[in-house]
Regions:
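Extracellular/periplasmic helix-loop-helix junctions in multi-pass membrane proteins
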Residues: 270-275, 345, 383-387, 408-423
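Transmembrane-helix bundle segments that line or gate the permeation/cavity pathway
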Residues: 26-44, 113-231
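Membrane-interface transmembrane-helix boundary segments in multi-pass integral membrane proteins
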Residues: 276-282, 347-367, 415-439, 443
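Short, highly charged, low-complexity non-transmembrane loops/tails of multi-pass membrane proteins
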Residues: 42, 449-470
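Long, contiguous internal "core" modules enriched in hydrophobic/ aromatic residues
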Residues: 9, 18, 59, 79, ...
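Hydrophobic cores of alpha-helical transmembrane segments in multi-pass inner/ER membrane proteins
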Residues: 120-125, 157-158, 209-220, 284-299, ...
Length: 479
């Protein structure tokens, strides 16, 4: 069995502690933001081009005075009314910028939280697919996937805390939760949000979120216990068949809840916008990341001798999935972007306008990281079985898909008030440390080999014919 070393425990706990301290500092700093800070930000943003704008205004006013000399008094009255309206607009803009500044620590934490929870969830879904498809090649890495899904419970609890905080108006992350958005008598009334209030309401949002988390964690709890029981059951595969049935039910519920989750937790950040393939898009970005994490831990455990039956063919198949779903993600990204951009419907293009202006570098950069790098590093069949190629390509993939989630969240919650600093780094450290700790701790508690699985022998003899093995491997890996 694998031994969770003291050094790795210390390392993972250190990451968690660093993350907690940095996140606490970020939340404290965010809570200290005032309307004066918002005014300074607005003033700084107006400095660029202020002189030329001033000159244009002066010229325009001179021309207007010459053309409307006889209506000077009326102009002054209109100007007074305009000043009153302008003051109100300025106050609203300052408040909006203040909310963006206060949102930043929440948003940075939410990006890392959603990414970590999503990866864990998709590892669980990929695990269920192996059960339902009754495949043979992946049996030796089932315990790796089970160990990774140990991260589901803590991230689910944290997500529930963030959701409850949002419902209690402790942040301004979800704009549809603002007061008065569905009250026709309020100055803050929003007809579009009101039209969607049957779905976007705090009670329904909270109930659905709890339901998602309960369904996912219930399956994980059941399948983990039943998988261990499978090793010693000796009951004519009855336990195995129960696990198959449970996995079928879970996958059915997963496909529904994953789409609904993406609408609630991500698309709900832009309540005026919608995309019919958004659930698939979120699925693709999380699935590629999940496969990468599975490959990383499999390579690590194999290097420590904990997975003696895993050979280059298993690694090769994981890399094939990483490559294939990177292409699938690119297809969905291009389909969503191209159709919306060229249809040029204002209600839809507004989503990409902010991302293509204020976030142009990360928006285009993630396409390079999520498509170009996987193509270059993983297209060659030989490279797919080389651990260091997979680590390089996988690291870029994970960074690229973190940026993808960053782009989904930040433009909606902080607008142009974004940069990469302590809040983002702290959140990443916390959830990386949590993933390492929960995975290694879970893997060290049980046998790494699912001895009771009827397809175990097939996995032990799995060999991809196109891979060149060494003489030692060749003697044991062939059928």
């Amino acid at each position: 069995m694998y031994q969770f070393s003291g050094k790795l425990k210390t390392f993972s706990l250190a990451l968690i502690i660093i993350g907690v301290i940095g996140t606490a500092f970020s939340f404290y700093s965010g809570s200290q933001k005032t309307i004066e800070d918002a005014k300074h930000v607005i003033e700084a943003s107006h400095n660029v081009g202020h002189g030329s704008s001033h000159e244009e205004t002066a010229v325009h006013n001179d021309v207007a005075d010459l053309e409307n000399h006889t209506a000077k008094a009326d102009t002054h009255v209109a100007a007074d009314a305009h000043d009153t309206s302008s003051d109100k607009e300025h106050a609203e803009h300052e408040l909006h910028v203040l909310h963006q500044l206060q949102n930043r620590p929440w948003s940075a934490f939410y990006v890392a939280l959603f990414f970590s929870l999503g990866i864990t969830l998709l590892v669980l879904a990929f695990y269920a697919i192996q059960r339902v498809a009754q495949v043979g090649w992946s049996i030796l890495i089932l315990r790796v996937m089970e160990a990774i899904t140990a991260n589901l419970l803590p991230t689910s609890i944290i997500m529930l805390v963030v959701i409850v905080a949002s419902v209690m108006h402790l942040n301004h992350v979800f704009p549809w939760m603002a007061e008065g958005t569905v009250d026709p008598m309020s100055d803050n009334y929003d007809a579009i949000i009101d039209g969607k209030s049957g779905w976007m309401n705090a009670t329904g949002f909270l109930i659905r979120s709890i339901a998602y988390l309960l369904i996912w964690n219930a399956y994980r709890f059941f399948i983990r216990r039943s998988s261990i029981k499978e090793d010693t059951a000796n009951d004519g595969n009855k336990t195995y068949k129960k696990n198959f049935t449970a996995s079928v039910i879970f996958l059915f519920l997963f496909m529904i809840t994953e789409s609904m989750m993406s609408w609630d937790w991500i698309m709900g950040l832009d309540p005026h916008w919608f995309s019919t393939l958004f659930g698939w898009y979120v699925l693709a970005t999380l699935l590629v990341s999940a496969l990468t994490v599975i490959a990383f831990f499999t390579i690590y455990f194999r290097s420590k001798g904990a997975l003696p039956g895993v050979n280059d063919s298993h690694i090769h198949d994981l890399a094939k999935f990483m490559f294939g779903f990177s292409v699938f993600w690119t297809y969905l990204w291009f389909s969503q972007f191209m159709l919306i951009w060229y249809a040029d419907i204002p209600e839809e293009t507004t989503y990409f306008v902010m991302r293509f202006t204020e976030y142009k570098l990360p928006f285009l950069g993630m396409v390079v990281m999520n498509f170009v790098f996987p193509i270059l590093l993983l297209l060659n069949s030989d490279f797919k079985s080389k651990p260091w190629f997979i680590f390089i390509g996988g690291f870029v993939i994970l960074v690229g898909h973190y940026v993808d989630v960053f782009i989904m969240v930040m433009p909606s919650t902080v607008g142009s008030q974004w940069y990469f600093g302590i809040p983002e780094i702290s959140a990443i450290c916390f959830f990386v440390g949590l993933l390492i700790f929960t995975t290694l701790r879970s893997f060290s508690k049980v046998s790494p080999i699912p001895a009771g699985n009827p397809f175990l022998k097939e996995s032990e003899h799995f060999h991809y014919y196109n891979i060149e093995h060494s003489d030692e491997e060749g003697s044991t890996d062939h059928h």
